[in-house]
């Protein structure tokens, strides 16, 4: 630690100058779970993910799990992955079988209706 005095961090903590990370996290969670704020913030992302899910189901896609969240886990033919990867950001989850892979598509607070429509057109 270069020129730092011995046990400097301990002295700072003892005098209350360094707040524990746990306290900061607790304050954030307390605010998020007050008056339904977390649900309000997440609602648009979840709504768009469910629109994506319904649109994919209508196109015949299968799902690894039935997710009520902003994350959807779809089963895709391996042959589609290179093309899909050049157009869409997705996460590899696992091989489903020799010919299929489970991928994760996620929406966020910044996802737009137009982006979901575009993704449905790509898929």
Regions found by a protein language model. Give the residues of each.
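Conserved C-terminal alpha-helix-loop-beta "cap" of PLP-dependent enzymes
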Residues: 50-51, 55-123
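Active-site C-terminal subdomain of aminotransferase-like
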Residues: 1-71, 75-76
């Amino acid at each position: 630690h270069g020129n730092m005095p011995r046990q400097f961090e301990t002295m700072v903590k003892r005098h209350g100058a360094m707040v524990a990370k746990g306290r900061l996290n607790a304050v954030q969670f307390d605010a998020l779970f007050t008056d339904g704020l977390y649900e309000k913030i997440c609602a648009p992302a979840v709504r768009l993910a469910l629109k994506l899910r319904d649109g994919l189901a209508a196109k015949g896609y299968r799902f690894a799990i039935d997710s009520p969240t902003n994350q959807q886990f779809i089963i895709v033919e391996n042959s589609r992955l290179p093309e899909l990867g050049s157009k869409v950001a997705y996460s590899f989850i696992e091989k489903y079988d020799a010919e299929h892979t489970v991928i994760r598509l996620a929406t966020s607070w910044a996802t737009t209706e137009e982006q979901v429509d575009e993704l449905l057109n790509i898929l």
